[in-house]
């Protein structure tokens, strides 16, 4: 979902 995308960006950091 949308949160998955946010968590994906945070994981990149």
From Swiss-Prot:
Expressed by the skin dorsal glands. GO terms for biological process: defense response to Gram-positive bacterium. Pfam families: Antimicrobial20 (PF08256). GO terms for cellular component: extracellular region. InterPro entries: Aurein_antimicrobial_peptide. Disulfide bonds: none annotated. Its main location: secreted. Signal peptide: none annotated. Keywords: Amphibian defense peptide, Antibiotic, Antimicrobial, Secreted. It is found in: Secreted. Weak wide spectrum antimicrobial activity against Gram-positive bacteria. This is Dahlein-1.1. The lineage of its organism: Eukaryota, Metazoa, Chordata, Craniata, Vertebrata.
């Amino acid at each position: 979902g949308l949160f998955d995308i946010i968590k994906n960006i945070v994981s990149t950091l």
